[in-house]
Amino acid sequence: MSEQQPEKTVAPVAEVPEVPEIPEAPESQPVTTTAAEAPKDTVPAPEAHPETHSEPKAEPAADVAAPLPAVAEAPAEAEDTAAAEQPEPEPAAEQQPEKPAYLAQNPALGQFFDRLPAILSATGHEEMWGVSLKDSDDVPTVNVLIKFLRANEGNVKLAEEQLTKALKWRQEMNPTALVESATYNAAKFGGLGYLTTYKDANGAQTVVTWNIYGGVKDMNKTFGDMDEFVKWRVALMEMAVKELKMAEATSVIEYDGEDPYQMLQVHDYLNVSFLRLNPAIKAATKKTIEVFTTAYPELLREKFFVNVPAIMGWMFAAMKVFLSKNTTRKFHPISNGANLAREFPALKDQFPKAYGGGGPALQDGARTVNLVQEPEAVPVPAPAPAPAPAAAEPAPQEEAKEESKEEPKAEPVAEPAKADAAVTTQEAATTAEAK
């Protein structure tokens, strides 16, 4: 038995160097003992202490096995490094600027702004109502686009088409120049259009344009040149738009809320006969409506038709059939103009007395376009007698031949009558139009 013990101790010493070659089987350490003594070494743990003093060399096996977790952790560290190197999607989302509330709440408005650069490029004009159209960060620009979008009930395509037409029209018409540098004949347009601005106790401003159609002195002169009439109306409208000060806006208007950038219009039809409107008036009125509908959307808060005969109420009832509710709700016919000021209690004292207020007359306290007194063209009678001498030359010869037979006929007098007949025809046509 004593000879077997040295063999048992020598065998483990010889196998110690081989322990590192078995890193994945730490349970194999008990295998180094012989089959006969395995139960003695493993069961009575206290008794094994004296005999295991020779096994401290086996502890390096445990030390060698200790780095195993480190080797196993290496792939995890590599995965962490690879994951860190992969781009994260979060920074990309953070780079997108947050949309303003007026764009987030109204996707159609955002789409309209997406089309704005193409619109400005196609028209070559960027000014609208004194506002230089820019981007969605510019408050005045936002308000302009909201008006065009609202006028088309949120339809982006229709709003784009209208804005394009309006920009082209402003480029061609140059309405700013119609106010600043153009002049208008006082004989044709004097006393027909005014602009007033009233403020209530809180400082809120109300802009009013007045169209006094009953003040027309000569229908043919005022409405005969349709283009001239439209320019005069545009000039008055541009004066009112300038008073709205849209370019100075600092807050975006609510799409469905109050809009401070709107005006009132008053059309006075005192002494105007609705039953005898000549074609010139109808043509000028139609053209004006077309221009204003395209170029000035959502600038009208309310329109008052004053001094309208009660019998003409059917006209406004018919208008409701062809116009949208959003438009007709702004129209207010008033048979007696003196009742107009009642509609605005806070401004009653500032309205003209003729309209039920306590303020000065329009001729004294209101503004108007640049009027000039132009000399009226005096008809020159020279062209009328011109053909008479040429036609009268053969007449005396015929009279000389017939002196002995009969008295001369009044042919020389009949020739000038042709010129008079032309004048008479023109007057008759004018009278017919007036009727």
UniProtKB/Swiss-Prot annotation:
Record-level Gene Ontology MF annotations: metal ion binding; phosphatidylinositol transfer activity
Main location group: cytoplasm
PROSITE patterns reported for this sequence: CRAL_TRIO
Sequence intervals crossing the membrane: none
Location in or out of the cell: Cytoplasm; Endoplasmic reticulum membrane; Microsome membrane
Boundaries of every CRAL-TRIO domain copy: 182-363
InterPro entries assigned: CRAL-TRIO_dom, CRAL-TRIO_dom_sf, CRAL/TRIO_N_dom, CRAL/TRIO_N_dom_sf, Sfh5
Feature: compositional bias, Basic and acidic residues: 48-60, 398-412
Superkingdom of source: Eukaryota
Any one annotated GO CC term: cytosol
Binding site for heme: Y213, R233, H267, Y269, K303
Role, per record: Non-classical phosphatidylinositol (PtdIns) transfer protein (PITP), which exhibits PtdIns-binding/transfer activity in the absence of detectable PtdCho-binding/transfer activity. Regulates PtdIns(4,5)P2 homeostasis at the plasma membrane. Heme-binding protein that may play a role in organic oxidant-induced stress responses.
Keywords on record: Cytoplasm, Endoplasmic reticulum, Heme, Iron, Lipid transport, Membrane, Metal-binding, Microsome, Transport
Record SMART domains: SEC14
Identification of the protein by name: Phosphatidylinositol transfer protein sfh5
Bias type Low complexity, positions: 10-19, 61-75, 83-99, 413-435
Catalytic reactions on record: a 1,2-diacyl-sn-glycero-3-phospho-(1D-myo-inositol)(in) = a 1,2-diacyl-sn-glycero-3-phospho-(1D-myo-inositol)(out)
Membrane found in the keyword field: yes
